[in-house]
A protein has these predicted regions:
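Conserved ATP-binding/catalytic segment of the ANL
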Residues: 20-90, 97-98, 114-115, 147, ...
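Conserved C-terminal "lid"/linker of ANL adenylate-forming enzymes
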Residues: 80, 106-112, 120-124, 137-241
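Short loop/turn microsegments at loop-to-beta-strand junctions
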Residues: 3-4, 53, 58-59, 103, ...
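Active-site lining segments that contact anionic ligands and/or coordinate catalytic metals
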Residues: 3, 27, 67, 102, ...
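Short acidic amphipathic segments
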Residues: 96-105
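Hydrophobic face of alpha-helices
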Residues: 27, 31, 73, 89, ...
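Conserved beta-loop-beta connector loops within the AMP-binding
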Residues: 1-31, 66-67, 129-133
Length: 241
């Protein structure tokens, strides 16, 4: 379209850096500018994440080749941010799909107290495969040039949640990864046999984890639970029932 500017910028902490334009072929966050671009949303609260220095941030990851062709490679919301490293989940998924024992896979970020997020992957093995997830992880390690991108864990699944268009439903996998991280934190805090309920609620761009404990949970245990989940740096609330 005439008068359209398209550029790919670097990311830092999941946010666009319009002062750092990516080199040809380098993957970054795609942004567009032009007279046909909307000046903003009716709800101004959405503008902060969608506009930067006059650019409309598409939310897509992409690259521009030396001839000016634009290629989309993924979604920015799927980027895994591990201790300041921006990890494209596609890098992990491609390494896994090259293995003959993998039929389908998806990589997501799992909350982590130290790194903020760690890369993990859910894997559906090929029919008849008996490989363990530990052996599978060891066999794909050499595929990664960036050590931070090596998944910390692989979770085996029999099937994936899918969208109506046949795509893997990654938000559901991120919730499962977060739930697993929370439960691992609480295993040493909450008495064995305690009934725990975990759910998620979406509000705008933010997803909140809701944790419900029994009404008779001791105050000191509640305090430790809040401290443990806070360390994962995810929005949450705790209630009793």
């Amino acid at each position: 379209m005439p008068f359209t500017q398209v550029s790919v910028f670097a990311m830092s902490g999941g946010k666009i850096q319009t002062s750092v334009e990516c080199a040809p072929g380098e993957v970054g966050l795609l942004a567009v500018k032009g007279p046909h671009i909307t000046p903003g949303y009716v709800d101004p609260s959405h503008n902060a994440q969608s506009f930067a220095d006059g650019w409309f941030v598409t939310g897509d990851l992409g690259r521009i080749d030396p001839d000016g062709r634009t290629y989309l490679t993924g979604r920015a919301k799927d980027v895994i941010i591990r201790g300041g490293h921006n990890i494209d989940p596609l890098m992990i998924e491609q390494a896994l799909l090259q293995h003959p024992d993998v039929q389908l896979c998806a990589a997501v970020g799992q909350p982590d107290s130290y790194s903020g997020e760690i890369p993990v992957a859910f894997v559906q093995l090929a029919p008849g495969s008996t490989i363990s997830v530990d052996n599978l992880l060891n066999e794909i390690r050499s595929s990664f040039q960036e050590p931070a991108a090596i998944p910390k864990r692989l979770y085996r699944v029999d099937s994936f949640p899918m969208t109506s268009t046949g795509k893997i439903l990654k938000p559901a996998l991120r919730q499962k990864a977060a739930e697993t991280a929370v439960m691992e934190k609480l295993n040493s805090i909450v008495p064995s046999g305690t009934s725990l309920e975990i759910s998620f609620q979406q509000s705008g761009h933010q997803e909140t984890l809701h944790l419900r404990l029994p009404a008779n949970t001791a105050p000191d245990v509640l305090g430790k639970v809040r401290e443990a989940v806070t360390s994962l740096r995810i929005p949450f609330n705790v209630s009793q029932a």
